Regions:
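Short, surface-exposed loop/strand segments
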Residues: 1-101
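Acidic metal-coordinating catalytic centers involved in nucleic-acid phosphodiester chemistry
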Residues: 74, 79-186
Length: 186
């Protein structure tokens, strides 16, 4: 069972990003999670970062794509945003924001049901580490242990449950929640 079964209807990219940022705030509060707004010149290919070297980027399909089209969109999004880690103009942004050496780049998607994106993530990891090896002075913001990790909604079951079931919400999510399913916390 997927945690997405508790969310009714289509989730927009903005709603997915808002939900992911809330989840990262909860999970990485002790690591001082900092969100990055895409306003004022862009987000540098990340939605936020922690002080222990985790950055994340969200992606939600714009519509119900075929498996092939969905993979193509995910692959292209990952390639574009990981590519920003290697471009001098984005490196400057990351350093100006105080992003520490990046150990993990999380690609956060609603569902992970295509092994090709895992393979592509490994290809991108190798490319980033090869670039770092070829020019270590330029890529000091990349850890020697750099990893690309695929995360999906089910990885944040606890955080999403807390967000959805919170009795006193001081935030607004653009989501409809199904109330006919009972959560199993075991």
């Amino acid at each position: 069972m997927s945690v997405l079964q508790f969310i009714e209807g289509y989730m927009s990219g903005n709603a997915w990003e808002d939900l992911c940022v809330m989840c990262y705030r909860m999970r990485y509060q002790d690591e001082h999670y900092t969100p990055i707004s895409a306003a004022q010149g862009g987000d540098g290919g990340i939605e936020g970062f922690t002080q222990n070297g985790i950055v994340h980027q969200c992606y939600c399909p714009e519509k119900n794509y075929s498996d092939e089209d969905n993979y193509t969109h995910m692959r292209d999004k990952m390639t574009k945003d990981i590519g920003k880690l290697l471009k001098p103009e984005y490196i400057k942004k990351l350093k100006d924001w105080g992003v520490p050496s990046i150990k993990e780049w999380h690609f956060v998607i609603p569902e992970q049901n295509d092994s090709r994106i895992v393979k592509h993530a490994e290809t991108k990891r190798k490319e980033v580490l090869a670039a770092k090896k070829s020019n270590p002075k330029l890529y000091t913001h990349i850890s020697d242990e750099f990893k690309v990790i695929i995360k999906c909604a089910d990885d944040f079951l606890l955080e999403i449950s807390r967000i959805v079931l919170a009795p006193h919400k001081d935030y607004h999510l653009n989501l409809a929640i199904r109330d006919a399913i009972t959560l199993d916390y075991t």
